[in-house]
Amino acid sequence: MKILVTGFDPFGGAHINPATEAIKLLPQQINGAEIITIQIPTVFRKSIDVLFRAIKKESPDMVICIGQAGGRYDITVERVAINVDDARIEDNEGNLPIDSPIFEDGAPAYFSDLPIKAMVQAMQAANIPASISNTAGTFVCNHLMYAALHYASQYQPDMKVGFIHIPYLVEQVVGKANTPSMNIQDIVRGLTVAIHAAIENKRDIKVQGGAIC
């Protein structure tokens, strides 16, 4: 089995992105699967081009994209991606799409086909704060997740796809009172456990993991 794991470059004036830092430290094999990592530009459309080239080159069985969700205190496994770009800030090339479909011919939304609840449960069992998220936002993270799921639906239906958001690193919140963060070691451990669970569980488990709002 081959798993492609992506991480974004820094954006929004930051000098670091925990997604890229974390994937650099992932083991080359997890649960018998080969782990291939690539950095993705935080740029609308270009991010998709880079991802699609990597998928065509590597032919992975699974794609897991990693992104930063500043303000979240835990590692969150995304449930769904929606077909809209609605940027609050510019991407790294100054693009600021508003209410634009990602793919004109795409479905309104795609659900991750990873075992998201099993992944969360495995991280929690390893004492890593984790939960399911029901929104990947409307910036480049959602853009990339949606594109990967759209690609799979059109060209590679056996390829599993999902997205994981991670908190700020500790060094990113210096001087930012009451801003949650997580150290890089726990992030890497959480991602490793989550990927292991994604490989292990061909179907998701039936446990509570929803939200009231």
Curated annotation (Swiss-Prot):
What are the UniProt keywords, alphabetically? Cytoplasm, Hydrolase, Protease, Thiol protease
Any Gene Ontology CC annotation: cytosol
Q: What is one GO biological process annotated to this record?
A: proteolysis
Note the InterPro entries from the entry. Answer: Peptidase_C15, Peptidase_C15-like, Peptidase_C15-like_sf, PGP-I_bact-type, PGPEP1_Cys_AS, PGPEP1_Glu_AS
Instruction: Write down the superkingdom of origin.
Output: Bacteria
Checking PROSITE patterns in the record gives: PYRASE_CYS, PYRASE_GLU
Q: Where is the active site?
A: E78, C141, H165
Q: Where does the record place it?
A: Cytoplasm
Give the reaction(s) catalysed: Release of an N-terminal pyroglutamyl group from a polypeptide, the second amino acid generally not being Pro
Primary site of residence: cytoplasm
Q: Name one Pfam family in it.
A: Peptidase_C15
Query: Would I find Cytoplasm among this entry's keywords?
Result: yes
Q: What does this protein do?
A: Removes 5-oxoproline from various penultimate amino acid residues except L-proline.
Q: Which HAMAP family match?
A: Pyrrolid_peptidase
Summary of subunit composition and partner proteins: Homotetramer.
Question: Which named protein is this?
Answer: Pyrrolidone-carboxylate peptidase
Instruction: Tell me what organism the protein belongs to.
Output: Alkaliphilus oremlandii (strain OhILAs) (Clostridium oremlandii (strain OhILAs))
Its gene name is pcp
